[in-house]
Amino acid sequence: APDSAWGQRMHSAFNTQWSALGGDITAMTTLTSELSDNETIANSLATLQSESRIKEIEKAFEAPVDSQARRRTDLDSVVLLSPTPQMAREIRPLLRFHYAGKLPVYAPSTIYQNGSGIANRDLNGIQFVLPASALATDSSRSQPLHALGLDAAALIDHFDQARETTGTLLFGETGDLSVDTMGNVHRRLKPAVIARGKARAVL
C-alpha cells in the first residue's frame, strides 16, 4: 500500500476483515519516497538478501556459483492495495522480476481503467471485483449511473419481499443485491481477472 491516508485506511480495513475471517498477514509493505519501488519490493520479497548470499559464496570460493536468487517462500498470495492503475502497472512487473510472478495477486477495483487495453496488459492475471455492468463492452462514463438507476427501480418493486425473505437476491447491474431485516441494502460484486488487458468474469 502507498504511504498515504488512503493506504493506511485500506490496510486497516483489510487487516480487520481478513483477521475476522481467520486469515493471517505474513508481511505488509508500504511504498514510500525514501526507497525506489524496486528496492521496496526486493526487500519485501527478500531477493536482495538471496543475491547477497550468492555473492558471498562466490567470493569465498573465488568462482561463480550456478544459482539464482530466490524470493521468500512463506507467501501464498499478494494483495496489492493500489489507489490508481498507474501504481499497479508499476508494481506488477516488479513482482514478476523478483520471482513472485506465479503468486496470485488480488487488488481493489481502483487498479482497473476500462478502455485502456494495451496499458492494462501489465496487470494481466490480477484478480479483483467489479459490478456486472462494468464487465460489459460499453465503456460509457454514464454507464454506472444507468446501472444504478436500473437496480434502484428493480429494488422498489421487490424491496419488502427481499427484506422479509432471508436469502433473497436480486441479480442487478451493479452486483448481487440483498436487503436485511433493518432495510439495509447489501451488494456483492462479481469476481474478475485481467486477461489481455481487459477485465474478464471469473466463471
Region spans (language model):
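Extracytosolic ligand-binding ectodomains
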Residues: A1-L203
